[in-house]
């Protein structure tokens, strides 16, 4: 049985330099949810994050860099005594093209350093997530520039559609659980 979502974590890098970069797809989805609910992020320096309150759920943005996201999420989970399965994580995914989102109940990091940090600090791989496709770099050896780069102007329309789809998937997951949401949103073509 799916655990109810109590905390939604968007992964990204803090600061203006990284706003609207591919690696910050998780932050972008969280910003949309916060706007929908009129929620305002406030700094929680002790737990290294920004937190906003949604309807029965916490929205959390780590204020650490991506590779250290667990330094925020692990302490938040323990402070609020949350089951890891109730911590829903949104992150970028280079293995999917822009336009594709996939929900996953649990699993390995798959090479994503932010997820590796979460697994290390949460002590488990068993937390649901939404993987937000950002596509592969155009050339070999350009991964860092790709994930830290901004979306191109010609990608903006598809980005907006995909952010809306991700927002819908989160809301559906909150109401119906990750299993049912995955059956619907994972079947939708990009």
From Swiss-Prot:
Its EC number is 3.1.1.29. TRNA binds at residues 18, 65, 67, 113. The record marks 92 as: Stabilizes the basic form of H active site to accept a proton. GO terms for biological process: protein quality control for misfolded or incompletely synthesized proteins; rescue of stalled ribosome. The record marks 13 as: Discriminates between blocked and unblocked aminoacyl-tRNA. It holds the Pfam family Pept_tRNA_hydro. One of its GO terms (cellular component) is cytoplasm. It is found in: Cytoplasm. Keywords: Cytoplasm, Hydrolase, RNA-binding, tRNA-binding. It catalyses: an N-acyl-L-alpha-aminoacyl-tRNA + H2O = an N-acyl-L-amino acid + a tRNA + H(+). The keyword RNA-binding applies. One of its GO terms (molecular function) is peptidyl-tRNA hydrolase activity. PROSITE patterns: PEPT_TRNA_HYDROL_1, PEPT_TRNA_HYDROL_2. InterPro entries: Pept_tRNA_hydro, Pept_tRNA_hydro_CS, Pept_tRNA_hydro_sf. CDD domains: PTH. It is an enzyme of class 3 (hydrolase). Gene3D superfamilies: Peptidyl-tRNA hydrolase (3.40.50.1470). The active site is at residue 23. Belongs to the PTH family. Hydrolyzes ribosome-free peptidyl-tRNAs (with 1 or more amino acids incorporated), which drop off the ribosome during protein synthesis, or as a result of ribosome stalling. Catalyzes the release of premature peptidyl moieties from peptidyl-tRNA molecules trapped in stalled 50S ribosomal subunits, and thus maintains levels of free tRNAs and 50S ribosomes. Monomer. This is Peptidyl-tRNA hydrolase. It comes from Akkermansia muciniphila (strain ATCC BAA-835 / DSM 22959 / JCM 33894 / BCRC 81048 / CCUG 64013 / CIP 107961 / Muc). The gene is pth.
């Amino acid at each position: 049985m799916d655990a109810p979502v109590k905390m939604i974590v968007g992964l990204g890098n803090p600061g203006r330099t990284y706003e609207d970069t591919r690696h910050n797809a998780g932050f972008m989805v969280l910003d949309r949810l916060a706007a929908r609910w009129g929620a305002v992020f406030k700094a929680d320096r002790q737990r290294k994050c920004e937190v906003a309150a949604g309807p029965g759920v916490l929205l959390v943005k780590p204020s650490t860099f991506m590779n250290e996201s667990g330094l925020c999420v692990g302490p938040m989970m323990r402070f609020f005594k949350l089951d890891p399965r109730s911590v829903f994580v949104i992150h970028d995914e280079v293995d999917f093209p822009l336009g594709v989102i996939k929900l996953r109940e649990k699993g390995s990091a798959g090479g994503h350093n932010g997820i590796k940090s979460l697994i290390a600090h949460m002590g488990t791989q068993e937390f649901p997530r939404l993987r937000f496709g950002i596509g592969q770099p155009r050339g070999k050896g350009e991964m860092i520039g790709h994930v830290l780069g901004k979306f191109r102007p010609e990608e903006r329309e598809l980005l907006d559609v995909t952010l809306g789809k991700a927002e819908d998937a989160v809301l559906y997951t909150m109401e119906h659980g990750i299993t049912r949401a995955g059956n619907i949103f994972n079947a939708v073509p990009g």
